[in-house]
Amino acid sequence: MQLIHFIVGLAMLISLSLAASDDRVLGWNKAHGLWGKRSVQEASQDKRTPQNWNKLNSLWGKRSASSFDDDYTTENGDDDVTMLYKRSNLSPRFLGRMTFARIPKISPAQWQRANGLWGR
């Protein structure tokens, strides 16, 4: 009787160890499929050009050399003041107390970056 229990126990132990190794192999294949094969495919995959990054352009602001030109100056400073009033979240009462001398010059490139990142 003890011999039968020993054989059954040994058979169960062997079957459990084989099942565990199959799970490990299956897990390795899943991991390889997620990381290894995908990485190889991406190397040969056609990428979008920066001009076709529509979703990124709407989220982060359009990326171009001119959008990062911080040396932008304008002859008419009223455009910058109007832009500041239009885009600010300050109350009209507070804005009424502000003088034009305190308003900093803000280039469109800075506004474009801020609009792309935080909306509005």
Swiss-Prot record:
GO CC term, one of those recorded: extracellular region
Propeptide section residues: 20-24, 39-46, 64-85
Cellular compartments annotated: Secreted
Any one of the GO BP annotations: neuropeptide signaling pathway
Signal sequence, renumbered to the chain: 1-19
Source organism superkingdom: Eukaryota
UniProt keyword Secreted present: yes
Keyword match Protein biosynthesis: no
Tissues where this protein is expressed: Expressed in the ventral and dorsal nerve cords and ventral nerve cord motor neurons. Also expressed in tail neurons and head neurons including SAB and DBI motor neurons.
Keywords carried by this UniProt record: Amidation, Behavior, Chemotaxis, Cleavage on pair of basic residues, Neuropeptide, Secreted, Signal
Modified-residue entries (Tryptophan amide), positions: 35, 60, 118
Role played: Plays a role in several types of aversive gustatory associative learning including gustatory plasticity and salt avoidance learning.
Protein name: Neuropeptide-like protein 38
Annotated source species: Caenorhabditis elegans
Lineage: Eukaryota, Metazoa, Ecdysozoa, Nematoda, Chromadorea
